[in-house]
From Swiss-Prot:
Inhibits the enzymatic activity of all phospholipase A2 tested, binding with micromole to nanomole affinity. It comes from Notechis ater. Optimum temperature is 4-90 degrees Celsius. Weak decrease in activity at 100 degrees Celsius. This is Phospholipase A2 inhibitor NAI. Disulfide bonds join C22-C46, C25-C32, C39-C67, C73-C94, C95-C100, C120-C145, C138-C165, C171-C191. Residues 1-19 form the signal peptide. It comes from the Eukaryota. Heterotrimer of 2 subunits A and 1 subunit B; non-covalently linked. GO terms for cellular component: extracellular region. GO terms for molecular function: phospholipase A2 inhibitor activity. Belongs to the CNF-like-inhibitor family. Optimum pH is 4-12. Important decrease in activity at pH 2. It is found in: Secreted. Keywords: Disulfide bond, Phospholipase A2 inhibitor, Secreted, Signal.
């Protein structure tokens, strides 16, 4: 409601000149039940995330839709690995207006990229702000070590701790606070360059 009031009062000063509305949802598979939200004044595009969680030979697909900012639309692919046998890949598409009704969802393959010679601490703790680290081999274009501590994940879990390899694009998305589909989430994160295996 606050974002709608702000947008309507000050909409004439926005670069878009209008109040943007986007579908919002998160769910398993390729579809999810959506509702419509009036985006904040600084959000000028709708974003669809298609995510694959891969632990060969099994993979899990998730989809989410939210408001976003167009300055991150070029960051359309991100990848992270918290474990040598687990990879999470996400592809994103941006749209506005009628285009969102016909734009097909982003498509991800199930292929896992090969190791690239870099390494990071890795771990995953659900419902906890701590996890036990082990060394993870980075894959593909993963050249950053990502560390996340999160809380207040609503229906999912109360806390999260995560460390692993990540693409530079994922670190940039965290800097832009891309997780607005879950409005109550609080996240602290840090990215540092991954090191060659011989340096660990």
């Amino acid at each position: 409601m606050k974002s709608l009031l702000f947008c309507c009062l000050f909409g004439t000063f926005l670069a878009t000149g209008m109040c943007l509305e986007c579908e919002i949802c998160i769910g398993l598979g390729l579809e999810c039940n959506t509702w419509t939200k009036t985006c904040d004044a600084n959000q000028d595009t709708c974003v669809t995330f298609q995510t694959e969680v891969i632990r060969a030979p099994v993979s899990l697909s998730l989809i989410s839709k939210s408001c976003g900012t167009s300055d991150t639309c070029h960051l359309n692919y991100v990848e992270t690995s918290p474990h040598n046998e687990l990879t999470v890949k996400t592809k994103r598409t941006c749209c506005t207006g009628e285009e969102c009704k016909t734009l097909p969802p982003p498509v991800l393959g199930h292929k896992v990229n090969p190791p690239n010679g870099l390494q990071c601490p890795g771990c995953l703790g659900l419902s906890s702000k701590e996890c036990t680290e082990h060394l993870v081999s980075c894959r593909g274009s993963e050249n950053q070590c990502l560390s996340i501590i999160g809380k207040e994940f609503g229906l999912f879990f109360r806390a999260l701790s995560y460390k692993g390899c990540a693409t530079e694009s994922l670190c940039t998305l965290f800097e832009k606070r891309f997780w607005n589909v879950l409005e109550d989430v609080e996240v602290d994160f840090k990215c540092t360059p991954a090191l060659p295996k011989s340096s660990q």
